[in-house]
């Protein structure tokens, strides 16, 4: 598997807005409504990625820990179901329910949101503080 380097939005960049369906309950979620009072962690991830699979329990725990600090977590999958059918909304919902995600899992069918964030691989993490300015962009760990 090839390592794909992430692109870096400049720190301080305003978070792009988005409005995407939550696969868990089919509700449209907008960043303005779901962001946390102290910040928002946006994770680009997908079901089939071995790095996501490896980190998933840690991601779930981080989301719970962050919520206690007023930081919302949002996961977004932008993979094409033509090339990765296991990353489609039905499979995303199964995973979210099985793992009891405490955060919305959104589907970016057009991949427009991923492009706006310059997300190039999974998982990609973007931490925005409360004014929606990029504070931190990095991989979860060295794995």
Role assignments for model-derived ranges:
Residues 1-143:
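Chalcogenol-based redox active-site neighborhoods
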């Amino acid at each position: 598997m090839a390592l794909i380097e992430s692109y870096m939005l400049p720190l301080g960049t305003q978070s792009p807005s988005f409005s995407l369906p939550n696969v868990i309950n089919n509700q449209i979620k907008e960043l303005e409504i779901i962001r946390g009072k102290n910040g928002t962690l946006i994770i680009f991830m997908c079901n089939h990625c071995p790095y996501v699979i490896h980190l998933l329990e840690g991601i779930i725990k981080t989301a719970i820990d962050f919520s206690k600090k007023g930081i919302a977590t949002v996961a977004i999958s932008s993979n094409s179901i033509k090339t990765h059918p296991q990353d489609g909304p039905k499979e995303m919902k199964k995973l979210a329910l099985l793992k009891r995600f405490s955060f919305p899992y959104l589907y970016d069918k057009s991949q427009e949101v991923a492009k706006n964030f310059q997300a190039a691989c999974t998982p990609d993490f973007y931490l925005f503080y409360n004014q929606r300015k990029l504070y931190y962009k990095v991989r979860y760990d060295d794995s």
